[in-house]
Amino acid sequence: MLTAHHLDVARRHDTILRDLSLSIEPGRVTALLGRNGAGKSTLLKTFAGELTGSVAPHGVRVTGDVTLNGEPLARIDAPRLACLRAVLPQAAQPAFPFSVDEIVLLGRYPHARRSGARHVIAHRDRDIAWRALERAGADALVGRDVTTLSGGELARVQFARVLAQLWPDHDATESGPRYLLLDEPTAALDLAHQHRLLDTVRAVAREWQLGVLAIVHDPNLAARHADTIAMLADGTIVAHGAPRDVMTPAHIAQCYGFAVKMVETGDGTPPVMVPA
């Protein structure tokens, strides 16, 4: 598991996360909900290993324990960590005119054979990149300059990149559960692509036994696709569990400061949240 235990994160004089404990389980999708500024991205970055060690931003203090498969996250070097977890950040706009293929192949660099100072991308890696593009519904974009893509098209390409990074590979040097961290993966997508992406996330979590943490702004979308929902408010988890148990008017009011009512759909899926 990927676990935070009694986690505190502060930036200068501001406490962002306080005494927070949360585990991301292999084979399951955890959706993280919370209002703007609640600390969701900070928690995801902590799980990603971006706030500790030499990469920690100036003025950020992290206390508590974060472990990946039982090993302290801070002790895992960057090459190993890149084989064990992939991160899709909010803003992933390339500054240079790479092709779609090149962006997705970046996901294979942690696994590539080294020849001196160079990484050698094998035919197997190119095949995995192509299959990842297909799985992400972005194969029609192959060959395009990424600077010409729409926001939604680029989001699907970047999703393919993280799929390629974690794609099951019998020649992989690292074994054990792996983890996918997604920061608002559906923000740039239309309605159909939002559901397709999260359907794919849930499918690969099952098939590859990935532990997934996804920040999602639409509680209804999260409830439909996640196995577990964690609600963040005032720097800590205020509700955690199955969508049907967590998605209540009281929890939504505590998390968002907004009154809602729940409407049953009658099809066995969690109730839908609407304004009260």
From Swiss-Prot:
Gene3D superfamilies: P-loop containing nucleotide triphosphate hydrolases. Keywords: ATP-binding, Cell inner membrane, Cell membrane, Membrane, Nucleotide-binding, Translocase, Transport. It is found in: Cell inner membrane. SUPFAM superfamilies: P-loop containing nucleoside triphosphate hydrolases. Residues 2-259 form the ABC transporter domain. PROSITE patterns: ABC_TRANSPORTER_1 (PS00211), ABC_TRANSPORTER_2 (PS50893), HMUV (PS51261). It is a peripheral membrane protein. It is an enzyme of class 7 (translocase). GO terms for cellular component: plasma membrane. Belongs to the ABC transporter superfamily. Heme (hemin) importer (TC 3.A.1.14.5) family. Part of the ABC transporter complex HmuTUV involved in hemin import. Responsible for energy coupling to the transport system. NCBIfam families: PRK13547.1, PRK13548.1. The complex is composed of two ATP-binding proteins (HmuV), two transmembrane proteins (HmuU) and a solute-binding protein (HmuT). This is Hemin import ATP-binding protein HmuV. It comes from Burkholderia cenocepacia (strain HI2424). The lineage of its organism: Bacteria, Pseudomonadati, Pseudomonadota, Betaproteobacteria, Burkholderiales.
